[in-house]
């Protein structure tokens, strides 16, 4: 089953949307993914080079840094941490100080705007996929954001995830029943398929039942 995850911005919240079982060659998802990957990579490079300018890390060029990373369509802070560990600049165990410095980049230098919920969901659905509201924490239910995303075309929801509280999981399950949503699970960067190729994967897995998987494959809810 094909899969991809995007980060959208809505009402001050960052909401992740996962696309499942889509046609990975469809122009809608290819063009959208390329646009997002290019934007994220440029943003990551800007934040990385800003850390160098502020003296937070040694002057290692961007090109040298990424040469130590697994080849990927885009680069994020996880890849910076991964490469700096290999280069002996900062151990993976001490990565918090790198992540803090990364977030302190001058906002005026950052021009990439996270994709909208509408554009993200449309790209996934146009490619024949299921648009899943990923790891919806309690605030997304309390603020009505989950309902808004469903109204925008989201037709799936993660009901099992390491970041979800017991209440959030119950709310997700109830939403799945009420709105006939496909159910999925996820581990993000904690599983063997993490952004760094599993090099620092935490063995935690949160999936779904075989029936829930087949429901997606068979498009039982349309």
Model regions: which residues?
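Extended substrate/RNA-proximal surfaces in nucleic-acid metabolism proteins
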Residues: 1-144, 212
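Charged catalytic cores and adjacent phosphate/nucleic-acid-binding surfaces used
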Residues: 1-25, 29, 115-133, 137-222
